Design a protein with these regions (language model features):
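Short basic helix-loop element that most often maps to the first helix and adjoining turn
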Residues: 18-33, 93-100
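Short alpha-helical DNA-recognition segment
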Residues: 28-46
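Short, basic-rich loop-to-helix N-cap that marks the start of a DNA-contacting helix
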Residues: 51-64
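Short, charged recognition helix plus adjacent turn
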Residues: 73-100
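A short, Lys/Arg-rich alpha-helix, primarily the initiator
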Residues: 2-26
Length: 100
C-alpha cells in the first residue's frame, strides 16, 4: 500500500479512541465490564475515550479484549511511504543486512 498522506499523532489517537469506543458500544460492553475483560482500569478507559491518552500496552489490552487481535498482528506488515523518494530509498536498501 502506498499512501503519501500525513496524519498527526493526536489525530490518530483520536481516531483510535473513537473506533475503540464505537466497538465497545456496538458490543454493549460497559467501561467497567471492559476493564474486567482487559485488566485496564475503568478510569483509564474513560480518559482514553475522552482525552485520547493511554499507554501502548493498555491500548493493546483493550483492542484484544474487543476482538482486534488479528488486526494488531498485521499492523506493521505493509509499509506505507510518505514520498516517492522514501519508497525508492527503501527499495534500494531491501537487501542490506546491517546498519552503519
Amino acid at each position: 500500500m502506498y499512501s503519501f498522506g500525513q496524519i498527526s499523532s493526536g489525530e490518530l489517537m483520536q481516531q483510535l479512541a473513537e473506533r475503540l469506543k464505537a466497538r465497545r458500544l456496538e458490543k454493549g460492553v460497559s467501561r467497567q465490564t471492559l476493564a474486567e475483560m482487559s485488566g485496564v482500569p475503568a478510569p483509564t478507559i474513560a480518559r482514553f475515550e475522552q482525552q485520547y491518552a493511554i499507554s501502548m500496552r493498555q491500548y493493546i489490552d483493550l483492542a484484544i479484549a474487543l476482538g482486534y487481535a488479528e488486526q494488531l498482528q498485521v499492523l506493521m506488515r505493509e509499509p506505507i511511504y510518505k514520498t516517492m523518494e522514501e519508497l525508492e530509498t527503501i527499495q534500494n536498501n531491501k537487501n542490506r543486512k546491517r546498519g552503519r
